[in-house]
Swiss-Prot record:
Protein's name according to its UniProt entry: Pyridoxine/pyridoxamine 5'-phosphate oxidase
GO BP terms in the entry: pyridoxine biosynthetic process
Pathway(s) where this gene product acts: Cofactor metabolism; pyridoxal 5'-phosphate salvage; pyridoxal 5'-phosphate from pyridoxamine 5'-phosphate: step 1/1; Cofactor metabolism; pyridoxal 5'-phosphate salvage; pyridoxal 5'-phosphate from pyridoxine 5'-phosphate: step 1/1
Catalyzed reaction equations: pyridoxamine 5'-phosphate + O2 + H2O = pyridoxal 5'-phosphate + H2O2 + NH4(+); pyridoxine 5'-phosphate + O2 = pyridoxal 5'-phosphate + H2O2
Pfam family for this entry, one: PNPOx_N
Record keyword Oxidoreductase present: yes
Higher taxonomy: Bacteria, Pseudomonadati, Pseudomonadota, Gammaproteobacteria, Vibrionales
InterPro entries: Pyridox_Oxase (IPR000659), Pyridox_Oxase_CS (IPR019740), Pyridox_Oxase_N (IPR011576), Pyridoxamine_oxidase_dimer_C (IPR019576), Split_barrel_FMN-bd (IPR012349)
Record function comment: Catalyzes the oxidation of either pyridoxine 5'-phosphate (PNP) or pyridoxamine 5'-phosphate (PMP) into pyridoxal 5'-phosphate (PLP).
Listed cofactors: FMN
Family: Belongs to the pyridoxamine 5'-phosphate oxidase family.
């Protein structure tokens, strides 16, 4: 089969302005709850897009760890490529692809670092193995073999066998403060429904976009 011949119809239903919540965070939480209840694989997985100092875009999958009225939170190694990008350009884009529900959410905004207290609160809630992995990996750095990483993990596991694991200085979180949030719902005959929430002077405005 040719790639150009791969297509399907979207039949889950449309999205109408009257059904939208006034606040996009409330609308996002409503859709996220439905994605979770539908038993989607990794419903909190999102594509995080950043750009380097030359304007070259990069994307990767990261898990959303919190969302509230202030924005969307994720955690990472502060030496990672994404964190280095955000140091010189805090503009960021998030994308949630909920394919089985024929939905997408696209977010643009600005990322800011979380406080040390916020980092510690989340880090200490993680399983011990996840804490050790965060400490063992210098994300995005070059390594000669997987064995180097596994060896470091085992070394740290032995070192902290009977004690608490400190929050690494090179690990932390970011909060993405949204400037726009677009909700996309697949529609019949490719007449998809798109609604864009844009923030102007502290208020959210909603516009329907052509598919």
């Amino acid at each position: 089969m040719e790639l150009a011949d791969i297509r399907r119809e979207y039949t889950k239903g449309g999205l109408r302005r009257k059904d939208l919540k006034n606040d996009p965070i409330d609308q996002f939480n409503f859709w996220l709850e439905q994605a979770i209840k539908a038993n989607l694989s990794d419903p909190t997985a999102m594509t995080v897009a950043t750009v380097d100092k030359d304007g070259m875009p990069f994307q990767r999958i990261v898990l959303l760890k919190n969302v509230d009225k202030d924005g969307f939170v994720f955690y990472t190694n502060l030496g990672s490529r994404k964190a280095q990008h955000l140091e010189h350009n805090s503009k960021i884009s998030l994308h949630f692809p909920w394919h089985p529900l024929e939905r997408q959410v696209h977010i643009t905004g600005v990322a800011e670092k979380l406080t040390a207290m916020e980092n510690m609160k989340y880090f200490t809630s993680r399983p011990k193995e996840s804490q050790l992995a965060a400490m063992a990996s210098r994300q995005s750095s070059r390594i000669s073999a997987r064995g180097v990483l596994e060896g470091k993990f085992l070394e740290l596991k032995q070192k902290f066998a009977n004690g608490e694991i400190p929050v690494p200085s090179f690990w932390g979180g970011f909060r993405v403060k949204p400037q726009s949030i677009e909700f996309w719902q697949g529609g019949e005959h490719r007449l998809h429904d798109r609604f864009l929430y844009s923030q102007e002077q502290g208020e959210w405005h909603i516009d329907r976009l052509a598919p």
